[in-house]
A protein has these predicted regions:
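Phosphate-binding loop and its immediate beta->loop->alpha context
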Residues: 27-150
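Gly/Thr-rich phosphate-binding beta-strand-loop-beta motif of the actin/hexokinase/Hsp70
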Residues: 2-31
Length: 150
């Protein structure tokens, strides 16, 4: 069993269509599984965001909202490969303008919350620190790499 004194260490593969997470566990790196909103166990979180009314939702919630016709953006990671993207860049979703940095931060916050509450390692208390290594998009320019790190 993992030592609870040290923070949980995760590797996050922020993929174009799905995001996969692995946990560091005594030299092993098992993939974290999740239960989606249809009660299926999957080894990923969908890399999607959507507007549910005026609220931005991510992952499984965004997938459901998109099925219901909500404005959504799949593969939003691709925005980071545009050389003109900076920390002040925005994206359009429906009639809303959203900061790319806010979208990325919101998605990764959703990932952390889902790891804590709805995953194969969901016993992680909210007070326990998570340390994550997030993969930087391969075809991103320097500014976009820094945006991901931010």
């Amino acid at each position: 069993m993992r030592d609870r004194v040290s923070p949980m260490r995760l590797g996050v593969d922020f993929g174009t269509t799905t995001t996969a997470i692995a946990i560091v566990d005594r030299g092993n790196y098992p993939i974290v599984s999740f239960v989606n909103n249809r009660e299926d166990t999957v080894d990923f979180i969908p890399s999607i965001l959507a507007l549910d009314g005026d609220h931005l939702v991510y992952g499984f919630d965004a997938e459901d909202a998109a099925r219901e016709g909500a404005p959504h953006l799949r593969s939003f990671k691709r925005l980071l490969s545009d050389p003109s993207v900076t920390d002040t860049s925005t994206l359009r979703l429906g009639n809303h303008s959203i900061s790319v940095l806010d979208a990325l931060t919101g998605f990764l916050t959703y990932v952390a919350r889902t790891v804590r509450t709805n995953s194969s390692v969901a016993s992680v208390p909210a007070s326990e620190k998570l340390e994550a290594l997030v993969g930087i998009p391969a075809h991103a320019w320097s500014a976009q790499r820094f945006l991901t790190l931010e």
